Each structure stands twice: as C-alpha cells, then as structure tokens.
Amino acid sequence: MVKIIGLDPGISKTGWAIISLNEKNNIEFLGGGTISTDGKLGTGERLHIIFEQLKKVISLYSPNEAAVEKIFVNKNPKSSLTLGYARGVVILALKITKLTMNEYDANYVKKSITGNGHADKDQIIFMVKQIVKNLSIKCHHVADALAVAICHAYTKGSCFVE
C-alpha cells in the first residue's frame, strides 16, 4: 500500500493530509490537520514548531512519498520570504525522515483536481470531497494538502479517476 503525505506550507498554518492507495488504486483519507503557530512568537520558534510537529506526523503515519505545493511570489516580498522559510523547514523535515519530495505548482494542483488552474478554495474543497468518499473537511489548508497528495497520485499514474 502506498501512503502519500501532501503538504501546504505556511508560517501560520501548514496543512497536511495523508492518503493511501490500495491495490485497486482507490484513495483513502487517513488523516489531516494543520500545524498552527502563534504570530506572537519569533520566526525561529514558529519554524521549530512546524519542523517538530511535522516530524511527529510523519512518524505516526509513516508515508512512503511526499508532495509539496510550490510557493508563488506575491506582491509582498516579506510574505513570500516568510513562506519560503516555512517551506524550507518542511523540506528539511522530509529530508531528515528520508522521504522523497515531489513539488507541484498550485495551478497544476488545481487543474488536476478541478480541471481549472485558477479554482478557488471552495472548488478545491468540493472536488476533494467528490474524489475521496465519506470525507468531512472544512479547513482549506487541509483541503489544499489533500489536493496536493491526490495530484501526486494522479501525476505518478498511481491512481486514475474512475
């Protein structure tokens, strides 16, 4: 059985989701959540929290593969830089736990899940609920992480929409 962790890095909230693929390539949602940090803490402390919590998630679920959403540069360079720090910590945690990282542009993830590279958060949540049966999810950070994991499964050819 293949287990994939999908990650949506962020300094305030890093979304994560774990899926498994069985022999028939059916997707099962095993778990998901957010790693939240307090904005009152220093950047270093926030990054340390993300790193330690992500290592715990990886240890608990033992995924075989990892998929991470690439960052985009927005109008605020400080926000982009801070997001880059969070992403760097996520990459480090994956490297330390010996997980191979696969990266996907946000537009590619959206297109593979919804058919629209510019889909909004509600469309992502709607589609992941269509793909993964009996899913109750409201947090867009978890939905984004789940979309990244599903995108990886589709891209690898491990899974196909029926």
Swiss-Prot record:
Keywords: Cytoplasm, DNA damage, DNA recombination, DNA repair, DNA-binding, Endonuclease, Hydrolase, Magnesium, Metal-binding, Nuclease
Cofactor: how and how many bound: Binds 2 Mg(2+) ion per subunit.
Reaction(s) the record says it catalyses: Endonucleolytic cleavage at a junction such as a reciprocal single-stranded crossover between two homologous DNA duplexes (Holliday junction)
Its EC number(s): 3.1.21.10
Alphabetical list of PANTHER family matching this protein: CROSSOVER JUNCTION ENDODEOXYRIBONUCLEASE RUVC
Role noted for this protein: The RuvA-RuvB-RuvC complex processes Holliday junction (HJ) DNA during genetic recombination and DNA repair. Endonuclease that resolves HJ intermediates. Cleaves cruciform DNA by making single-stranded nicks across the HJ at symmetrical positions within the homologous arms, yielding a 5'-phosphate and a 3'-hydroxyl group; requires a central core of homology in the junction. The consensus cleavage sequence is 5'-(A/T)TT(C/G)-3'. Cleavage occurs on the 3'-side of the TT dinucleotide at the point of strand exchange.
Protein name (Swiss-Prot/TrEMBL): Crossover junction endodeoxyribonuclease RuvC
Native source species: Wolbachia pipientis wMel
